[in-house]
């Protein structure tokens, strides 16, 4: 069990971009390879299911029993049978979220059609999960589920559920005291394009969470701007519809959109993992510009996942892209380490050798302060621990954003870290509101630091057309600890 630090918190804004001439090398070590040897995994999702502050890991498979790995100080045990999560159905999506507001992370699982409901909701009671789909009135028996996201759409403290479908209209299930009702048509989110990935964030900084939807098979992407609870597709106007691919064709598309602050200017950028070269849209002025070529990542590829995070604690956000396995070809994976406004591939050989092509998570699974890598794919799935030097691994902050009752139900909240007592921005990250295709987490936000021993943390909560800010000041830097910030 790791030590928690709970603090109360207000706001400040500014930035200073660190320059890096030579990126710190990164390496990862596989753990418990025998345990993670089962093939044909598609989905992973992480959360602390038992309240010990360690991140546990759910892995969904393509027709063999699903697994739930309980994490005890970095050692994993499959407890799926005892927990009630060992269904042997083709699993295409999973997301943890506190559906009933009791403080535990419940689990929504999306299954392939043909053998029962395609959406199943499991209530968590101290690590034991019970099927409550019927009591939640969540009756969906058809549809190719691709991405599920818990988000508080109406800012009432209950987590609502967004579902991206590849073959039917997308859905937004409003949570009213545990009852889930699809209201997507009435609010403008029932898009019928072939959707696979989705992420929510306040892209235009107006106090409402918008949603980026990645679409496949030549369909343009959707970017749905939220205005007073109604959504308008502004992807074309904002330059994000093509995902960096013009023209869109039947063989290309966007699988997973990722949102974060890539260039450390305090504003949200968008990465798109594509069938085709990836895109990197930096927020510039009132819009976004694709700088993938200038940043060195516009190479032909077929990627199922993108993940942002500082893997080497140099203060700059790095990018993991995994290549799909299709048509007998294993497209390459990339670990782009950022240096001097470029992204340079430094993927270790043992990471590249994992046939990962779906779920990917960068999270701190062993509590040392550094980001580890969890992968799924057609071969063995894998958990790879970051081997940063212990002192360097601690040079980060981990921030858990909770409400006034201590519940981790604020997806889309923005966390910024400043050098203590100054307005020098050291890093920014989002509370997970849709990690993208086949991956999700309820986990502390991680920000790596190149310098600074003490920091100020500020949390911006977009809700109801306002951007409420809270802060924690003069926090000692130690990534082994979790700083809990309570927001309204």
Descriptions of predicted regions:
Residues 21-39, 70-89, 123-143, 174-193, ...:
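Blade-edge motifs of beta-propeller repeat domains
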Residues 33-36, 326, 342-488:
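Gly/Ser/Thr/Pro-enriched helix-cap/hinge segments flanking short amphipathic alpha-helices
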Residues 34-64:
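Beta-strand-rich domains and repeat architectures in extracellular enzymes and scaffolds
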Residues 42-51, 92-101, 145-155, 196-205, ...:
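Beta-propeller blade termini
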Residues 52, 56, 102, 106, ...:
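Acidic carboxylate motifs that coordinate Ca2+ or other divalent cations, activating on Asp/Glu
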Residues 55-61, 107-112, 161-165, 211-215, ...:
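Hydrophobic beta-strand segments that make up the repeating blades of beta-propeller
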Residues 64, 113-116, 168, 217-219, ...:
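Short glycine/acidic-enriched loop and turn motifs that connect beta-strands
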Residues 67-69, 118-122, 171-173, 222-224, ...:
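A short loop-to-beta-strand structural motif that recurs across blades of beta-propeller domains
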